[in-house]
Amino acid sequence: MAQDIKNEEVEEVQEEEVVKTAEETTPEKSELDLANERADEFENKYLRAHAEMQNIQRRANEERQNLQRYRSQDLAKAILPSLDNLERALAVEGLTDDVKKGLGMVQESLIHALKEEGIEEIAADGEFDHNYHMAIQTLPADDEHPVDTIAQVFQKGYKLHDRILRPAMVVVYN
């Protein structure tokens, strides 16, 4: 019987030690789990911040490229009326050949400078395209002139790469 009491006491002590060790390891595991969760949270925040910085840099680069690509837009819009006036001056009757030649040279140099900056004249012959042309008048269509074709150009249109600076003002068969 004394032996049984001793065995029971030993078992109780062992059980208490097991319970104590389990209680001691449980908080450690939960602290470790909390630390891992916080580490994961910080890693996610870091990855998001890193991705956001990359997006900001990409957008800034795109914006810089667009500014560079379209830098001459305002200047071109200011020069186009002068180019139109030169064209009208060349169409006037009674100018001497020397004056026409001089005006033609100025016109050519302006057109060349605009082309170097990526500014092109919009083609205004054939089919009417509302993206590039502005119909300011219509004429009745017939057998020779199908519907939605351009009859006459009142003012040339220009584009800078893929941007329309000014649509071509045209007369359209309707």
From Swiss-Prot:
One of its GO terms (molecular function) is protein-folding chaperone binding. Transmembrane segments: none annotated. It comes from Streptococcus pneumoniae serotype 4 (strain ATCC BAA-334 / TIGR4). Keywords: Chaperone, Cytoplasm, Stress response. The keyword Nucleotide-binding does not apply. This is Protein GrpE. The lineage of its organism: Bacteria, Bacillati, Bacillota, Bacilli, Lactobacillales. SUPFAM superfamilies: Coiled-coil domain of nucleotide exchange factor GrpE, Head domain of nucleotide exchange factor GrpE. It holds the Pfam family GrpE. InterPro entries: GrpE, GrpE_coiled_coil, GrpE_head. It is found in: Cytoplasm. Belongs to the GrpE family.
